[in-house]
Amino acid sequence: MQQVKKVVLAYSGGVDTSVCIPYLKKEYGISEVITFVADLGQGEDLELIRQKALNSGASQSIVGNLVNSFVERYAFPAIRANALYLDKYPLSTALARPLIAENLVNIAREFSADAVAHGCTGKGNDQVRFDLAINALGPDLKIITPAREWNMSREEAIIYGEKFGIPAPVSKKSPYSIDVNLLGRSIEAGILEDPMQEAPEDIFAMTSSIDNSPDSPLDIEIIFKNGFPVGINDEFLTPVEIIKKANVLAGEHGYGRIDMIEDRVVGIKSREIYETPGLLLLIKAHKELESITLNPDIVDFKGIVEKKWGQIVYQGFWFGPLKDSLDAFISSTQTSVNGRVKIRLYKGNAIVIGRMSENNSLYRDDLATYSKDDVFKHSLAEGFIYMWGMSNKIWAELNSKTTD
């Protein structure tokens, strides 16, 4: 196999990716490591992270602002898909991986690199997402995965990094693994590995506790056009602004925490903690608006599509033919998803209290009402029921037991 001379490394500044830099150079004999830091709205000082990569031995360190692309190309399609893996997790972390992988491949092309690398461990989901996306976009590129091969625990990786002057950003006694982007935070490891251990309050940053959330409810309205959120409380916003505002409103009222047992791609169950206040709020509102603007059979079948969409994105198949086909179906359903949804935020809850669509509502007052304005033809119900239940009645007559 040809010796790799230049590699592009997905870099976060955390333990694993920081240790990857000296490890790639020392153990793999790679002469040039270029790091890529993705700005996904995580709120960190990315210039410090870029400098840390250079101090750790990177020949170049690139920061890419991907926030707009992340929201418009990844988060908003997930909202249209009502994407909830295992009916709970809105894919806040999973959505970022194919975007990062896409940029890794582009940078590798730009700098004529032989390979790309990431710091994912051998039993996580991200390794699958990165590898599948890279193979789809750059099948000729070699993928190097040091953390999958070095057999070091997190504590040992911290010690290895310290030998090369790399400071660890976590406590050795409580090494939580935290991933942050504009859509939310994921927290794992440490005492959270005990599924009966309550998550300590100090791990949360985007959401208030129930005790600290306001004692008065807040009613908000979310506006949609073609299935995309476009405004909150009559204020029309950019996609990024909508996510930010939804995060603040929902998070302040304690909505958006997820504590779940998750079925990982590699076959194990893991305990995961997520904070995704804005994304969960927008998905909830979008799904509610669909209930008044889509035909029942579309809603029913779209539910099947949504589940599959969430599964394949979680499993790493963002760049694939099935995902493209599901996207096409979802997109075809969204032209009528226009209107607004009223939600009450209170003490960890987001309660739908109203929904309307001026031009696309399938709800008709004159058919739904029980008042004198009712135009529903009640007399036709008997014939409908007779035909609707015919097959069941025939079965019952055939199988009923008669008594003398």
Curated annotation (Swiss-Prot):
L-aspartate binds at residues 121, 125-126. Its EC number is 6.3.4.5. It comes from Prochlorococcus marinus (strain MIT 9215). Pathway: Amino-acid biosynthesis; L-arginine biosynthesis; L-arginine from L-ornithine and carbamoyl phosphate: step 2/3. It is found in: Cytoplasm. GO terms for molecular function: argininosuccinate synthase activity; ATP binding. GO terms for cellular component: cytoplasm. This is Argininosuccinate synthase. Disulfide bonds: none annotated. Belongs to the argininosuccinate synthase family. Type 1 subfamily. Pfam families: Arginosuc_syn_C, Arginosuc_synth. ATP binds at residues 10-18, 38, 119. It catalyses: L-citrulline + L-aspartate + ATP = 2-(N(omega)-L-arginino)succinate + AMP + diphosphate + H(+). HAMAP family: Arg_succ_synth_type1 (MF_00005). The lineage of its organism: Bacteria, Bacillati, Cyanobacteriota, Cyanophyceae, Synechococcales. Keywords: Amino-acid biosynthesis, Arginine biosynthesis, ATP-binding, Cytoplasm, Ligase, Nucleotide-binding. Homotetramer. It comes from the Bacteria. L-citrulline binds at residues 89, 125, 129, 177, 186, 262, 274. GO terms for biological process: argininosuccinate metabolic process; L-arginine biosynthetic process; urea cycle.
